[in-house]
Amino acid sequence: MSSSEGNSDASAPGTPVKSSTPSSRGSSPDSPKKQEPSKKRAILNESDDDDDSRPAPRQLSDSSDDNIHPRGGGEKSSPGAGGGLFGDLSGSSDDDSDREGKPKESNTRARLSDSDAESRGSLNDLQGIVMANPDEIDEDEKAKEHVHDTEMVTGRVTLEYAADPPHFVRMPNFLSVATHPFDPQHYEEDEDDEQAKLDDEGRTRLKLRVENTLRWRVRKDENGKEIRESNAKIVKWDDGTMSLYLGNEIFEVSLVPLNSNNLPHLYVKQPTLMSAQAVLTHRMTFRPHSTDSQTHRKVTLNMADRSRKNAQVKVMDDVGQNPEITRRENARKEEESLRAHIRRTQMVRNNFKVRGPRYAGQYSDDEDMPTSSRKGKKKEAPIIGASSESEDDHADTTKKSGSDSDSDEEYRKRKQQQKKQIVTSDEESD
């Protein structure tokens, strides 16, 4: 009776849930039925951390089997009456959660698969540019990537630098670098000049013998150890500036930082690959120290020669007469033709004056007509650039002019005599 009353008291309304479930305090260790709920409660406490495994709230259905009797009822409840209300709920919570969780997960997966199929079908129906899912692209790229592992034998090259890191240098046209070591026995300056005429970029370099060529050699010190020497050195001053001493020439050195987005690298070439050794962050430039240096004079002279316009010389293959002589001859011929034309016009005018209407019948046909009626003629000026032949022609013309003057005098005398005869005959007739 005590056990049944205890169960009926636990199943009374208004009592807490913890009191309804049998615990290990009021039960004996020999009853296995009272120990099972405690184990199931422990499982429920462990599943509280997982949100997905939490059981859904269960609705109690009103049935004739689950009637709740008051504490003072005359009917005795069976030992499992209280457990039908609360014990079964706590005892079967895990089973119910498993049964309800699996259908929900299957339903959600079915819905996702249906939505993916619908979205893919809608994408296939679209036309134009379709934005792809980046997750799908990554999966496709990973599937396409094939990594090939190959074995290669290469030499490990390590370069030793000074305290300062290496710099990028673009050599100007007035500086050269000899890559091979200097050997005075096999050195030939002429061959070196021919090799340094053009640089890698096709520019003509200024060769100043040994003044602007960086050289190095290998020699042994007192202990017999090989050391390297050079004819150039860089001096860093207190103010931070640097100078390059190359023989007797001095050049100013300046460092300029390079663009950080595109930095050049120093590589060592090997048969199958190129191994990077350092990153070059600064560029080094050189310029002559003063205008009195031999390098600066050489540079300025070279620029002046390129800017100077040389006179164009025409080469004549056919050698003929002197053009100056031919020009003078042509001028003389033109002058002679002009003088001859003037003489002809003057003679025509003079003849017209002599043969006037008054004296037309006074002359016979056999009588020679005077060539000119001028009392005197001006002496002709000598022709410019006249030759010996022209002088002979001039002498002939002077003789002819002399004979013409004589004929004119005879003509005047003859005319005066005729006038006298006419006058005397008129007087006699009177």
From Swiss-Prot:
Name of the molecule in the record: RNA polymerase-associated protein LEO1
Annotated segments matching region Disordered: 1-128, 349-430
Superkingdom of the organism of origin: Eukaryota
GO cellular component terms attached to this protein's record: Cdc73/Paf1 complex; cytoplasm; nucleus
GO biological process, one term: positive regulation of transcription elongation by RNA polymerase II
Compositional bias of kind Low complexity: 18-30
InterPro entries xrefs: Leo1
Source organism (scientific name): Caenorhabditis elegans
Role description: Component of the PAF1 complex which is a multifunctional complex involved in transcription initiation via genetic interactions with TATA-binding proteins, elongation and transcription-coupled histone modification.
Phenotype reported upon loss of the gene: RNAi-mediated knock-down is maternal effect embryonic lethal. Embryogenesis proceeds more slowly, with embryos displaying defects in the positioning and shape of epidermal cells.
Keyword Transferase in annotation: no
